[in-house]
Amino acid sequence: MGNNIKVTFNPDKIAAWWPAVGTYYTTTYPQNQSVFQPGIYQTTSLINPKNQQELDSVLINRYKQIDWNTWQGFPVDQKFSLVSRDPPPKPYINQSAQTFEIKPGPIIVPGIRDIPRGLVPPQTPTNRDQGRKPTPPTPPLRDTHPHLTMKNQTFHLQGFVDGLRDLTTTERQHNAYGDPFTTLSPAVPTVSTILSPPSTTGDPALSPEMSPSSLLGLLAGLQVVYFLWTKILTIAQNLDWWWTSLSFPGGIPECTGQNSQFQTCKHLPTSCPPTCNGFRWMYLRRFIIYLLVLLLCLIFLLVLLDWKGFIPVCPLQPTTETTVNCRQCTISAQDMYTPPYCCCLKPTAGNCTCWPIPSSWALGNYLWEWALARFSWLNLLVPLLQWLGGISLIAWFLLIWMIWFWGPALLSILPPFIPIFVLFFLIWVYI
């Protein structure tokens, strides 16, 4: 845009100055016209005039294009409050028109915020203007420390920021580009007028990934893992005690450590120190116990996946089947990754026999059918398994809890009744 221009008009003229972009309006008939308040920031600018006459002619033509009754031709679709409708007081009679001079100012592009410079007071004419030609305009200086000016202009920039916020729209930018008095210049780096609030020292703020609820969940998870680990160690120690007791029906004796290289105190075989000969055997038993626990965990995971239907296995004896053309039966269980799955056989007749894979317990059904094909007596367990399958999950948990706590005590009571239980079971199956 053009540079800011300071102009002093003749006493019989009135000028309204928008200093942010250098827009001027004037008239030679100010008796019934409005006097606009300076400091309104617009998005239009005048090309730097060469002399006072050129400036007056351009401003008068520009002023005549505006219909002050309907506000047609005004550069921005916005009405401003009137300051006064009375003509300004007449200045001193002998005051003559002064020449204008160009002052450096910031380059402003519509839509980009910039910091306006303060108004420069008029300079008194010197002898250089009388005997010599006007001094050529000084090139604009580069503002290398804009933050120093922002510190003192914080309160003055509030109105400027509000004005630019209303002017950075698509319609007003279109009006600015369509104005014949608009000149554009390349954009320059500017300093934002929005000041960030001062930061306070203290505890660092938690990131969104580590909210207080997630932190509490992590701590609770660590406690659960520690609790389970201690329980696993306790279970391994109890199983080790049970395994050792199988070798000593009369009770587990104490290990004195007399035959070892290093004399040790009396201790149990399930808690041998490293200097005892039974230390390596104790850890071998513990290692086997941990492998068995891991195997149980894998079996539990396999059962869970089979229950969800993630293990597609073709059944040995399908319950439902369909016969289709072999050209349509080209997808096997190994080629599909989303249920429902389908198993297909391609006989020589040209037709395919397809049957669906169960959506749940496919592997279990396959293993059960395979066992029934080799052990026919397993059919006797079908009613019992069907009855157990009808028990709710809560009943299973209660049964496991009762066996866990009362099982060892019931072992000494139930052996006499085991034959009776077997007899009742056979009667219930065959009758």
UniProtKB/Swiss-Prot annotation:
Record-level GO BP terms: caveolin-mediated endocytosis of virus by host cell; fusion of virus membrane with host endosome membrane; virion attachment to host cell
Segments of this protein annotated with the region Disordered: 115-147
Listed InterPro entries: HBV_HBSAG (IPR000349)
Entry note about domains: The large envelope protein is synthesized with the pre-S region at the cytosolic side of the endoplasmic reticulum and, hence will be within the virion after budding. Therefore the pre-S region is not N-glycosylated. Later a post-translational translocation of N-terminal pre-S and TM1 domains occur in about 50% of proteins at the virion surface. These molecules change their topology by an unknown mechanism, resulting in exposure of pre-S region at virion surface.
Covalent lipid adducts (N-myristoyl glycine), residues: G2
Region (Pre-S1): 2-148
Glycosylation site residues: N351
Ranges annotated as spanning the membrane: 215-235, 287-307, 380-400, 407-429
Biological function: The large envelope protein exists in two topological conformations, one which is termed 'external' or Le-HBsAg and the other 'internal' or Li-HBsAg. In its external conformation the protein attaches the virus to cell receptors and thereby initiating infection. This interaction determines the species specificity and liver tropism. This attachment induces virion internalization predominantly through caveolin-mediated endocytosis. The large envelope protein also assures fusion between virion membrane and endosomal membrane.
Localization per record: Virion membrane
Residue ranges of the region described as Pre-S: 2-207
Ranges in the topological domain labelled Virion surface: 2-214, 308-379, 430-431
Post-translational modification: Isoform M is N-terminally acetylated by host at a ratio of 90%, and N-glycosylated by host at the pre-S2 region.
Keywords on record: Acetylation, Caveolin-mediated endocytosis of virus by host, Fusion of virus membrane with host endosomal membrane, Fusion of virus membrane with host membrane, Glycoprotein, Host-virus interaction, Lipoprotein, Membrane, Myristate, Transmembrane, Transmembrane helix, Viral attachment to host cell, Viral envelope protein, Viral penetration into host cytoplasm, Virion, Virus endocytosis by host, Virus entry into host cell
Main location: virion
Top-level taxonomy: Viruses, Riboviria, Pararnavirae, Artverviricota, Revtraviricetes
Annotated spans, Pre-S2: 149-207
Name assigned to this protein: Large envelope protein
Gene Ontology CC, one term: virion membrane
Stated family: Belongs to the orthohepadnavirus major surface antigen family.
Species annotation: Woodchuck hepatitis B virus (isolate 8) (WHV)
